[in-house]
Amino acid sequence: MEAPICLVENWKNQLTVNLEAIRILEQIAQPLVVVAIVGLYRTGKSYLMNRLAGRNHGFSLGSTVQSETKGIWMWCVPHPTKPTHTLVLLDTEGLGDVEKGDPKNDSWIFALAVLLSSTFVYNSMSTINQQALEQLHFVTELTQLIRAKSSPREDKVKDSSEFVGFFPDFIWAVRDFALELKLNGRPITEDEYLENALKLIQGDNLKVQQSNMTRECIRYFFPVRKCFVFDRPTSDKRLLLQIENVPENQLERNFQVESEKFCSYIFTNGKTKTLRGGVIVTGNRLGTLVQTYVNAINSGTVPCLENAVTTLAQRENSIAVQKAADHYSEQMAQRMRLPTDTLQELLTVHAACEKEAIAVFMEHSFKDDEQEFQKKLVVTIEERKEEFIRQNEAASIRHCQAELERLSESLRKSISCGAFSVPGGHSLYLEARKKIELGYQQVLRKGVKAKEVLKSFLQSQAIMEDSILQSDKALTDGERAIAAERTKKEVAEKELELLRQRQKEQEQVMEAQERSFRENIAKLQEKMESEKEMLLREQEKMLEHKLKVQEELLIEGFREKSDMLKNEISHLREEMERTRRKPSLFGQILDTIGNAFIMILPGAGKLFGVGLKFLGSLSS
């Protein structure tokens, strides 16, 4: 993108998603690092974001007391250090703009920035003091503006206890900072400055409680915190009015150094935007999230992460089924030369392509808890396999009929000119027909319908052969009877040979179905184990953070608040234990994937038994 575009418009107190911005996001298949900046209006947020983009111009700065940015603006740029990622910068409307009609929109802008970003930058002026913390009261409203789960928890634990599992990293950017970084006479880092400012203070009055609430929320919701303090870019007020046009060498050296540190930190440490369960957010996924959240706000409900992920999963999993099925069809078409000599040749290619297709689906799908979409894939691939089998059979029939047409041309001419209407004509006819059969045997790649087409050809000749046999004056009645019996025997042998081929092909189809069933179950088991490990890692991180906060509160002298976390920590430990001991879901898998096979595949009762045996071997 050459310039930013409005992502969420804020017009007359109504939030609207800009569909042009969504179309841009839909073109980005890479994972995203999403950096959002929030803060009071006219505090230099846009200028800082332009520096992240490596440009002087981009997000509009303005030079008056009026807020320039309205809604949320987006700028997608190549990530400077991660070529496989796209950096998405979100510049938000300034908080506290006196020209706004409804201050509630400030809260929604703040909440959207938290929900959409992987790194959340709060921008303020001068120092982190009581006033700065009061201005950040929006963080205390997040419990009313965001929900993690779609329904209340049965264990009565607050929904906000889940926030730590999906909230972004938090950066506090302090602009025009003129103080010395010292505490009790010793130098401290910016991070230590922030953590000291976030320590709770003793006191029971309302003002202290409110500022402590802000401190608690920041510490509790945002496990990863960082602070940067910036000098004023220039002491020349005239240059400040047109700061975007000021060359780098005219900026204060300290500002340059701190800006470089800030950008370098985000480029190096800014994490990929992910959802619960390790779902990586790409451009099109971010677009879906934006629309889902804004629709929820406009409908009067609270944006819910679980609902958003479910909406996203429905859309993405449908696409994953299509992508996997298309991969199957494309690879089958590329690797097969019709007609194949045998059905097994086709089924071998099918097995390889199906395995790849399942892998494609697993890679692009998530939260398919009931295996609804994997079941659709099973059905779709089976339908497409059957279509390839039909195409293969049709190609074999066309090829064989064409070859028999060519080989039997002389026979037809001989019949037309009466060459077999002579004594000994039946013997001559049999020789001519045998020559056709021998020539047919030499034809390459006749395909799976070779015997069937030959049988049809011979059947079409039966009346003519009998006519020639009956009119052959060189034969006695006994010899005619023997010849007729021999012909019947040959027909029966060919019928038996064809039946054996069909039985063999049916066995091959059953083997292919069993292999397909095993492949689906194995891949699903692998994915479920991976998701279980991911969930445990997330829970372990949450537990580690809650224990850290609990210990800090105890050290700071807030035992009551520390004790209040015990219930959450206890419930989280119970959840982790349930996750570890989660019973096998193979029965559920069999109900879904197995039923898909039972509905669409011949001989599925046998296959179902194979599935039970296979699942037993996996779960033992």
From Swiss-Prot:
Residues 375-411, 477-582 form a coiled coil. GTP binds at residues 39-46, 61-63, 91-95. Induction: By IFNG/IFN-gamma, IFNB1/IFN-beta and TNF-alpha. Up-regulated upon infection by T.gondii or L.monocytogenes. Its main location: cytoplasm. Its EC number is 3.6.5.-. Transmembrane segments: none annotated. It comes from the Eukaryota. It holds the Pfam family GBP. One of its GO terms (molecular function) is GTPase activity. The keyword Hydrolase applies. Brain, lung, heart, spleen, kidney, liver and intestine. Keywords: Coiled coil, Cytoplasm, Golgi apparatus, GTP-binding, Hydrolase, Immunity, Innate immunity, Membrane, Nucleotide-binding. GO terms for biological process: activation of innate immune response; adhesion of symbiont to host; cellular response to interferon-beta; cellular response to lipopolysaccharide; cellular response to tumor necrosis factor; cellular response to type II interferon; cytolysis in another organism; defense response to bacterium. It is an enzyme of class 3 (hydrolase). It catalyses: GTP + H2O = GDP + phosphate + H(+). One of its GO terms (cellular component) is cytosol. Residues 29-271 form the GB1/RHD3-type G domain. It is found in: Cytoplasm; Cytoplasm, Perinuclear region; Golgi apparatus membrane. Residues 1-304 are annotated as: GTPase domain (Globular). Belongs to the TRAFAC class dynamin-like GTPase superfamily. GB1/RHD3 GTPase family. GB1 subfamily. Heterodimer with other family members, including GBP1, GBP2 and GBP5. Dimerization regulates subcellular location. Interferon (IFN)-inducible GTPase that plays important roles in innate immunity against a diverse range of bacterial, viral and protozoan pathogens. Hydrolyzes GTP very efficiently; GDP rather than GMP is the major reaction product. Following infection, recruited to the pathogen-containing vacuoles or vacuole-escaped bacteria and acts as a positive regulator of inflammasome assembly by promoting the release of inflammasome ligands from bacteria. Acts by promoting lysis of pathogen-containing vacuoles, releasing pathogens into the cytosol. This is Guanylate-binding protein 3. It comes from Mus musculus (Mouse). The lineage of its organism: Eukaryota, Metazoa, Chordata, Craniata, Vertebrata.
